Regions:
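Iron-sulfur-cluster electron-transfer modules
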Residues: 14-15, 24-208, 213-239
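Internal glycine-rich alpha/beta core junctions
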Residues: 1-28
Length: 239
């Protein structure tokens, strides 16, 4: 359908990935105009967009389907192209930037949790952003707890000091934004379990992996974020 309308989806995707801040600003007026006039022009993409809203991006389809249809993958590709023509809801930017905001929000966890516990805040987020039942941040700080337990950070400098035997008996935990900030106790339980198994535990300093960006169709930002994370992981894998 996009091809019949004269739209090269692959080229549109390439442009969006390469788009910088200025490109985003230049296309803003066009996206505003398209969004305001969307009811006046038939675009089948709107129906696809509504259907894709029901995808949880869990990839169960890819695991269960005999031909491995990956709905989350083409959903993110569709969202990238779709929002090249139409405005995104504010919710997309909040979800996409979650990994980058969490370390800052964790510093004021009591205030954040107190606000989210208010009914009027939950109602405002539900009606204004389409978000409800947002989880509360863990009161405990993984970083502080690890420091108190004497658990070393996994860095090239710290791993370079290990002997071959020590490396064979060591394990590195790569932090996930949501587990570390919403389920800190689970992270510490894993550290304790591995320690009791006589393994030396190292924890990689937290850094975003870009998954929320990929889910919301910010594929250009996702690729840049994922490449940075992959570079960090490759540096540790050398040891």
């Amino acid at each position: 359908l996009q091809s019949q309308a004269g739209i090269d989806v692959v080229e549109e995707s390439r442009k969006k990935k390469a788009e910088n801040g200025w490109g985003f600003i230049k296309s803003f007026r066009l996206r505003v105009a398209n969004t305001l006039s969307r009811k006046q022009h038939h675009d089948y993409s709107h129906q696809v967009y509504d259907a894709m809203a029901g995808c949880l991006a869990c990839k169960s389809c890819a695991g269960q389907c005999p031909i491995k249809v990956n709905v989350p993958q083409f959903r993110s590709q569709f969202l990238e192209v779709y929002h090249g023509r139409y405005l995104r809801p504010l919710r997309d930017y909040i979800i996409g930037g979650t990994e980058f905001m969490l370390p800052t929000l964790a510093k004021v966890a009591p205030l954040y949790n107190a606000l989210l516990s208010q009914r009027w805040v939950d109602s405002l987020m539900r009606k204004g952003l389409g978000m409800s039942d947002s989880p509360l941040l863990s009161r405990a700080s993984v970083k502080k707890q690890l420091r108190a337990w004497g658990v070393a950070e996994a860095t090239p400098a710290s791993l370079a000091l290990l002997t071959d035997q020590q490396r064979a008996n060591s394990v590195i935990i790569v932090q996930d934004a949501f587990t570390s900030h919403f389920e800190a106790k689970l992270v510490m339980d894993v550290v304790e379990l591995l320690s009791r198994l006589n393994l030396r535990v190292f924890v990689m300093p937290f850094s975003a992996n870009g998954k929320p960006l990929q889910v919301q169709g910010f594929l250009g930002a996702f690729e840049r974020t994922a490449e940075k994370q992959a570079k960090r992981l490759r540096a540790l894998a050398e040891f």
